[in-house]
Amino acid sequence: MILEHVLVLSAYLFLIGLYGLITSRNMVRALMCLELILNAVNMNFVTFSDFFDNSELKGDIFCIFVIAIAAAEAAIGLAIVSSIYRNRKSTRINQSTLLNK
């Protein structure tokens, strides 16, 4: 693939995720948008690693590291969301005042 096409696609994914993260009022949707942002960043890591340094796997290894961190973040985030839903019966961000007390 051409470098510019992949970078434009990654920028679109990043901007869609950022827009969703800013405008989202649902915690699960916000987590999904955060994962979309991380996938756009991973796409850039793999693209630049392949384009600039074809023999090294530094970008690919860093991408696997980010995927592992994102999986842990998603698991912890969903556990927190399910706990808040169990206690508050809502997953709306603006209704959750659990951390303010």
Swiss-Prot record:
Q: What's a GO biological-process term for it?
A: ATP synthesis coupled electron transport
Keyword Transmembrane helix listed: yes
| UniProt-annotated location(s) | Plastid, Chloroplast thylakoid membrane
Record's keyword annotation contains Nucleus: no
Cysteine disulfide links: none
Q: What reactions does this protein catalyze?
A: a plastoquinone + NADH + (n+1) H(+)(in) = a plastoquinol + NAD(+) + n H(+)(out); a plastoquinone + NADPH + (n+1) H(+)(in) = a plastoquinol + NADP(+) + n H(+)(out)
Keywords attached to this entry: Chloroplast, Membrane, NAD, NADP, Plastid, Plastoquinone, Quinone, Thylakoid, Translocase, Transmembrane, Transmembrane helix, Transport
Q: Give the GO cellular component terms, alphabetically.
A: chloroplast thylakoid membrane; NADH dehydrogenase complex
TM stretches of this protein: 2-22, 32-52, 61-81
Q: Which GO terms of the molecular function aspect are on file?
A: oxidoreductase activity, acting on NAD(P)H, quinone or similar compound as acceptor; quinone binding
Identify its membrane topology class.
Answer: Multi-pass membrane protein
Reported EC number(s) for this entry are 7.1.1.-
Q: Spell out the family assignment given in the record's similarity comment.
A: Belongs to the complex I subunit 4L family.
This chain's function reads: NDH shuttles electrons from NAD(P)H:plastoquinone, via FMN and iron-sulfur (Fe-S) centers, to quinones in the photosynthetic chain and possibly in a chloroplast respiratory chain. The immediate electron acceptor for the enzyme in this species is believed to be plastoquinone. Couples the redox reaction to proton translocation, and thus conserves the redox energy in a proton gradient.
* Subunit and interaction comment: NDH is composed of at least 16 different subunits, 5 of which are encoded in the nucleus.
PANTHER family reported in the protein's UniProt record: NADH-UBIQUINONE OXIDOREDUCTASE CHAIN 4L (PTHR11434:SF16), NADH-UBIQUINONE OXIDOREDUCTASE SUBUNIT ND4L (PTHR11434)
- The protein's name is NAD(P)H-quinone oxidoreductase subunit 4L, chloroplastic
Taxonomic classification: Eukaryota, Viridiplantae, Streptophyta, Embryophyta, Tracheophyta
Q: Which gene encodes it?
A: ndhE
